[in-house]
């Protein structure tokens, strides 16, 4: 049962543990908010379009950070935009995840030596998955999001909130 968390019994019932069911639900229901700052946002739109269709992975775009648990940062983060990004991140519900998309979001990119650029969004918010490229392709973003889904499913049960805790 460790290799396959869902087991089909002879009577047609699916037997699993609560942890495996919670992991599957969290993995397949990541609602994301786009934080498109530059040209990488165009590739993010391609990934959300009909050809790659992020909805089939359970990833639905939301406009409000209070409804999201995933932020995709795409593009050059400037010093002026950094406090706004942190404020939006703080408004997101727990557990929250961040995907850094593109060279500019990962480490400053082409504008690394500019006085007005933050050299990586991980200096402002904790990043879970980095997607390299300038700009990264839609396939690379989808692969990065699949890696995030794997990471969400493999979280330990100790880091999840307790549903039925004794007082």
Curated annotation (Swiss-Prot):
**Description of how the protein assembles with itself and partners:** NDH-1 is composed of 14 different subunits. Subunits NuoB, C, D, E, F, and G constitute the peripheral sector of the complex.
Q: How is the cofactor bound?
A: Binds 1 [4Fe-4S] cluster.
| Family according to the record | Belongs to the complex I 20 kDa subunit family.
* Protein name, entry field: NADH-quinone oxidoreductase subunit B 2
Name of one Pfam family that matches: Oxidored_q6
Q: Which EC number(s) are documented for this chain?
A: 7.1.1.-
Sites where the protein binds [4Fe-4S] cluster: 39-40, 104, 134
Which reaction equation describes what this protein catalyses? a quinone + NADH + 5 H(+)(in) = a quinol + NAD(+) + 4 H(+)(out)
**UniProt keyword Nucleus present:** no
Query: Which Gene3D superfamilies does this chain map to?
Result: 3.40.50.12280
Species assigned in the record: Burkholderia mallei (strain ATCC 23344)
> What cellular component terms from Gene Ontology apply here?
plasma membrane; respiratory chain complex I
Which cofactors are required for activity?
Answer: [4Fe-4S] cluster
Q: Which UniProt keywords apply?
A: 4Fe-4S, Cell inner membrane, Cell membrane, Iron, Iron-sulfur, Membrane, Metal-binding, NAD, Quinone, Translocase, Transport, Ubiquinone
Q: Where in the cell is it found?
A: Cell inner membrane
Please tell me whether the keyword Lipoprotein is annotated for this protein.
Answer: no
Q: Which PROSITE patterns match?
A: COMPLEX1_20K
Q: In what way does this protein cross or attach to the membrane?
A: Peripheral membrane protein
Q: Which gene encodes it?
A: nuoB2
What is the role of the protein in this entry?
A: NDH-1 shuttles electrons from NADH, via FMN and iron-sulfur (Fe-S) centers, to quinones in the respiratory chain. Couples the redox reaction to proton translocation (for every two electrons transferred, four hydrogen ions are translocated across the cytoplasmic membrane), and thus conserves the redox energy in a proton gradient.
**Any idea which GO molecular function terms this record carries?**
4 iron, 4 sulfur cluster binding; iron ion binding; NADH dehydrogenase (ubiquinone) activity; NADH:ubiquinone reductase (non-electrogenic) activity; quinone binding
Main EC class the enzyme belongs to: translocase
Which GO biological process annotations does it have?
aerobic respiration; electron transport coupled proton transport
